[in-house]
Amino acid sequence: IYKALVRVGNLAYLSGHGPCLDGVTYRTGRVGLDLTLEEGQQAAREVGLSLLATMKRELGSLDRVNRLIKTLALVNCTDDFTQQPLVVNGFSNLFAEVFGPDHGVGARSALASNTFPGNIPVEIEIILELKD
């Protein structure tokens, strides 16, 4: 049981999202085994699209967002895969396109894991600053 987005003052905390929209998973698999680096980047971009859809639904408009503060990204990958930051660039590039290089880029962590619910390749949670 959880909420997709929780507001505290002018901050919005978004729960972890996968490359899913309307209950449909776009992509599954582990990067470095089932997916290439490029496919992992596309999966991270798809996670970004899912987050944008949640933001629009919960906030009413993306215009309510002032900036991205923090991204925590987890990449489902093999033990020897070490390019998690490059995978997560698929997400980061999308948010930079949507919100600009100043407001769409924040602090970021890109970590590895080797198992995810539904075998999704990437899960991302974010913290946003909202406009007054």
What do these predicted ranges mean?
Residues 1-132:
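Short, polar/acidic, helix-capping and beta-turn segments at strand->helix junctions
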